[in-house]
Amino acid sequence: DGSWKRSTGQATIIYGEVMPETGGETHFCDMYGAYERMSDAWKARIADLRAVHNLDFSRTRRHGEDPMTDAQRLETPPVDHPVVRTHPETGRKCLYLGDHAEYIVGMPYAEGRALIEELNAMAPHADLTYEHRWKLREMIVWDNRCLMHRATAYDPVTQGRVIRRCTVLGELPV
């Protein structure tokens, strides 16, 4: 969580208070494994790249929801992070992308977008992913620095979903 911030989240804790009957699952992807499975040529290609992460892009332009106000855009300006992040505790490298990554610094926009989409598509291998099907009052904790996550769609008109989240502040990705 929070890749659109300069200092990113170290860990996230979420608690399922109200869950839909269908949909709303949370999927996780091991980004250590995704990086480690890449060929040496791919690793060399992306080693020094930086991606710009932008909340306005992921919320408004990418998904067409929750348009941000000008004040919100000023509070959350785009930030750049390395595409390959080194975990500060384990020293292992992992891909650091996801939905908020908009473009690659120094690359033509369309080319950078295509590369991000390709890398995001390469990451999820069946044995590197986990789908959590929520039960009421469950809690999950994960390390944001090496896992990518997303929720599946559900119908908010007919079903409720209330997730309480606490993000432990982290550090600047390197």
Which stretches of residues belong to each language-model region?
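Non-heme Fe(II) oxygenase catalytic core, chiefly the N-lobe of the double-stranded beta-helix
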Residues: 1-139, 144-174
